[in-house]
């Protein structure tokens, strides 16, 4: 598993409350053909927080099946409890994915020790490599560099998606973590300076719409062509601003639908369709980037969850996990 380069945090296509498999497969093929290093399913951009565990497993399984090993498939693992995270990991065991993106538990606001126990417990109950995911603006808790350095000692914890947007944080992580521990930014607007501070790549929202430009920017950075990288960064800035004008993934899912990458911009409640002003901003950004698109009204959000074909059942109450995580009580 190589957590380096451009990983696209893809949207989850939906139709009438259910996962749209045809659009999902088409989206994965388009990303593979663009040349990205990997695809992340059911993260923040993939609406993992509103999907059932079975839906999340289904999306990951379909993505892995469509990719056929041509790119790495990373499944998002988000939860409020460690047990729920473990239950999802168990469902994902035979899905064909290459790794896990495990986010800090939301709402509970665990201490540093609690976060460490959470991640180590997950690591002890999977055979897949793990990328930590720190996004305090969504989860309400910030995984500190000292904790990351401790977690990086575990053989299966090999990377972090750092989405604070802090360049100081990037420097701290590079100084405290092993050289082979991958640092990925989860904040598109700061990708260029993050890479300059020792980053290894990005997990990107922008690359849903502009994978070629993101790949060119990272290639320019790697080649030391910083002027060219800066030009590409400036070209992508209006799009990045438009994609975060409202809560992600509302704008990017709309953009994917306008571009014909997915059949519908349908969201899962409580997310709601893009506002008129944000839609105008998005249209201007796509035009500036030279994209041809057909602007259309977004459908109403669905309640969900939908039925999952070939549903794999797992009774959470009967699952047993190893809690001997090596962390002092």
Label the model's feature ranges.
Residues 5-11, 34-36, 203-206, 210-296, ...:
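C-terminal alpha-helical cap/extension of soluble enzyme domains
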Residues 303-309, 321:
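Glycine-biased, low-complexity coil/linker segments
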Residues 2-8, 12-15, 20-140:
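Active-site beta->alpha loop and helix N-cap motifs at the rims of alpha/beta catalytic domains
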Residues 34, 58, 62-67, 91-95, ...:
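Alpha-helical structural signal in soluble globular domains
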Residues 298-300:
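Ser/Thr/Pro/Gly-rich low-complexity, intrinsically disordered segments
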Residues 138-244:
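Catalytic alpha/beta core domains of metabolic enzymes, predominantly
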